[in-house]
Structure formats: C-alpha cells, structure tokens
Amino acid sequence: MDAGLDNPFWSALQTIHRDLAETRGPVARYPAEYAPFAGVASPDGDCGDALEALTGEGEAVYLLGIAPRAVPAGWQLQAFRPLAQMVCDAPLVVTEGPEIIPLTETHRRDVLALTAKVYPHYFRTRTMSLGRYFGIYQDGQLAAMIGERLGTDASREMSAICTHPDYNGRGCARRLTAWLT
C-alpha cells in the first residue's frame, strides 16, 4: 500500500500538487480556492505559527491522517473523527448506462451547482484543476459526477462522487465509480 496514504494532504502537497503548495516549515496547504486542506509533516512539530501564517482569520482547515499531537495555541479543534480510507485493488465491473463525459472548464458552472447542492464546502472554485473529473448528463442537467482530486505518485483519490437528488437510485454514482477504476 502507498505509504503516502497515511498522511494524504501532506503527501499530495509534496508530490503531485507540489506546485500549488503553500508551505511554511512543517505545514503545507492548498490555496483556499482549491481546497480547505492542510497537512503537517509530523505530529510532533510545532506548527502553530505556520498554520496561523497560512490561514485567514476564522478560516477552517481540515487535516487528515497525521495531525499535531497538541492543538496549537490560538486554534480550536472543532471535530476529530475517524475516516474510512479504502483502496481498490481491482477494477470494478462497469454497468451499462448513460454516456460518461470528461468535465472541462465549459462544465464548471454545472459542477459548482451540483457540488453546492450535495457536497458543499469541500469543492471550491478551482478544485477541478486538481485532477480529472467526469460526469453524466441527463435531461440537459449534470446528474452525477466523479473526480480525482488528491493523490501521490502512486495513488489517486476518487472524490466528489455525487448525484443530483432528482437522479438518485439510478446507478449513476456506481457506474461512474466502476468506470474510473
């Protein structure tokens, strides 16, 4: 398994997204218009000053995997939750269904509307620039989408797997997930 998955935000910002990384000492983050994610190199580092320098007043950032052992002065831990991280070892069987198309800059308005409705806060105005995104249109509307956002040199995250509520239960998300594996 890819060791970078133990500290995915930090790993992505040191590998495939190194050109985007805003880094200060032991902390790196995505620019806010891309994602609200930051990573720390080690749980033992003193990262309070670096976090403060890299974030705006009142801005929430999310860490995944490795986090500071102690909450830096001036910061508030609002939630600490477990997260299931799954690795697909073999491609899934793709079911028949509607056409899957690459989502490009011309689809940005539709993508932002769908993610605002069903996947708010984590998908930002420039998130699509982080990787490849694909979708299914039905009745002239973006019915479902999937993308690859984070990653390392060896792995990619499937992200923004979402379906418009009017199209739930039709297998669109499953089709997209299988197709992308």
Where are these regions (language model features)?
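Acyl-donor-binding surface of acyltransferase catalytic domains
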Residues: 2-96
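A generic "binding-loop/recognition-motif" signal
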Residues: 67, 107, 154
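Conserved acetyl-CoA-binding loop-helix of GNAT-fold acetyltransferases
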Residues: 46-51, 163, 169-181
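A short, internal acetyl-CoA/4′-phosphopantetheine-binding micro-motif in the GNAT/acyltransferase core
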Residues: 36-41, 161-169
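Short amphipathic alpha-helix that is part of the acyltransferase structural core
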Residues: 1-5, 89-121
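A conserved beta-strand-loop-helix scaffold within acyl/acetyltransferase catalytic domains
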Residues: 122-165
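Generic beta-strand structural signal
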Residues: 82-84, 98-99, 132, 144
